[in-house]
Amino acid sequence: MVNKFRLTNSTPVATPMVTGTTFSTADSLSTPTPVACMCRIPYVEVIGSVLWPVIVSWPDAASAVSILSQFMQNPRPAHWEALKHVIVYLGSTKDLWLTFSSQSKLTAEGFCNANWGGQKYCHSISCYLFHMGARAILWSLKKQHVVALTSTKAEYNVQTHVAKEGLWLCSFLQELHSTPDDPLIINCNNQGVITLAKDNKFHMHTKHIDMCYHFIHEVVEDGKIMVQYIPTGNNVSNIFTKPLAKAKFQELAELLGLHTITHKV
């Protein structure tokens, strides 16, 4: 893609999206000239080209692609420039690999977060991933179906989805004859959400939360999952919430299990 779009001479970049970048679904093309220009741009084709690799092997670029994929029906020049930035990033980090060790333990651990009001649209973004042997094996970014009125509700929704995915992962590991003795750990940086998942003591203040989301409360009570606090700066799922500065992005990318591997001929 770098060669196809004549980006080989572009200056290498260290992050897939510039820090502080925000887009709005309300943005639209108002003049005929940019409309005609964007009609000739293969925006949807490029999104499709990078979407599948991001799902299976490029977690570091997942947030940028997720944001830009929301504008496939009506992309603007700014979206196209941001997408080219992603392509340049992937070319700049072609030696960055998701690595695994044969000595890694088959013990899963989850991390979750929510982008509540981070971009200029109403629906929060659920972000979570699972580690195994300190390497990312499964990750997801998805727009929530309902508008969360508080960050607590947004993150509580995420916990429910990560709990369901975690139980499936535990079942899969059992088929591999790797049955964990301890509950599956899910890390969260919201103390209120953790308290709600454990004892639901804020019932009168959270009754607007649909009962289906209290699934997490049940699996915690059953001892299948343990929700624990992790400082925001150490929560690796933060790499999915918004465009980060270079230093923090690279720190979290390393926690994903991404390392530079130089091949010698």
Located regions from the model:
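Long, low-complexity, charge-biased intrinsically disordered regions
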Residues: 1-265
